[in-house]
Every structure is written in C-alpha cells, then in structure tokens.
Amino acid sequence: MKMPCFVASMMMLHTLLAADVNAKELVYTRAFADDDYGIYHVAVLHALLNATKEYGDVTLVPYPQPITQSRQMLSLLKGEADIMWSVTNQAREQKLIPIKLPLLKVFSGFKVLVINPSRREELTKSADSRTLKSLTMVQGSDWPDIDVLTANGYSVEGEDWSLWFDSMYSMVSRNLVDAFPCNVIEVHRDLERHKDKYVTLEQFHLLKYPNYEYFFVSPDNPT
C-alpha cells in the first residue's frame, strides 16, 4: 500500500472515531464471544484512539453478544453499534462507510484449503483448476467470498458459522464437503483449535483473488 493512501486512510478513521467529542464509548461488533477473537483489530482501534486523545477519552466496548456479519451491518445501521470489520464488497460499501485501510493487506484474498485427509490422493500437485472446481467447498453464508468463488466457477455451499468456524471444520471432517478455503494468516491458528477433528491443510494449491478487509461505520452515525 502506498504511504499517501495509508496516511489518508488513517486520518479518515481518526476523524470518524473522534468526531463526537462527547462520546465516551465506542461499540464494536464481533462474530465470536471468545476473548481471542479480534485481538488484532481491537488493538488497531486502541492505537487509533490513543493517537487522538485530544478529542477526549473513549472506551472500546464489545457488542453484548456475537452476531453474524449481516446482523453486524444491521446493528450499525440501527445505531446499536459504531464500528465493525469485514471483507468488503459493493453492497457493504453502498450501505456503510468503508475505511479503506486494508487490515490484512492483500493476504485476506490468499486462501488455502482445509480438507479431509482422505482427499490427499485426488488433490496432488498435478491437480488443475478443473479438479478444484469439481469440489464442493464451504464458506460462511453471509461472506462476500461466496459470490467471488461462485462467479469464477467454484461450487460453494453457505453455512451459518459458529464459534471459530466449528461447523465448517466439522463438515470437512465428516466429508459433508470437500474443502474449506481459509485465510492464510488465520488458518494455522484455527487448525490448532480444531486438532480433534479429522482435517488437514492441502499442500499444493492457493486460491488468490482481490479481497480486502476494512473497518466500517454507519453513514448515519459515523463516530
């Protein structure tokens, strides 16, 4: 990311977060209740608030319960929460204000495949895109990735996601689907959490597409 764009994004987020000098709390949404979820994103928000102390002290507060991405968007639009983070798409940028600071840089669009070990023989180094497109994959039912993958000829099922994607890993473990494309940054952490399941990391293929994760705020309540 070029430095001028980075600085501009940081300044915009500073302005939005500090716009209401009387604000005492900033409510962020979350997908999981686990304390480990969103550590990086919350740390970024803390750093930004620490850099704008001249606007007053603001406390970060999690939304009372974990909710799906579609419900997170709704909570911002209703004024029940102030900020969320998510992979972007056109619909989200039309409804909310995106802060175009790529939180994971380009790596949000680098996906490796979590598979059942029984799939290793068919997913060899020589397997081509036709082989990959013959697989049934799984993603969160409200993730923008579904649209990207299906538009490019992949077969994808949507699943209501649960704590640390347990339902997706269980589907792979039970051979209900063939693969779960996962972010390269997060996959090893998640595999460690699901080491009790019969899953492994496919070694030879990488799905790569433009995919950026941003903070979002409501256009009606940009604080």
Regions found by a protein language model. Give the residues of each.
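A bilobed periplasmic-binding-protein/Venus flytrap-type ligand-binding module shared by bacterial periplasmic
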Residues: 111-127, 210-223
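Bilobed "Venus flytrap"/periplasmic-binding protein-like clamshell domains
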Residues: 34-48, 113-156
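Short beta-strand-to-loop elements that line the ligand-binding cleft
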Residues: 57-68, 138-139, 156-168
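Extracytoplasmic small-molecule ligand-binding "clamshell" domains
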Residues: 23-97
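Bacterial N-terminal signal peptides
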Residues: 7-15
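A ligand-binding cleft/hinge motif common to bilobed small-molecule-binding domains
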Residues: 75-77, 83-96, 178-199
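Ligand-binding "clamshell"
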Residues: 24, 91-103, 190-205, 209-218
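Short helices/loops that flank or line small-molecule/ion binding pockets
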Residues: 65-81, 152, 166-186
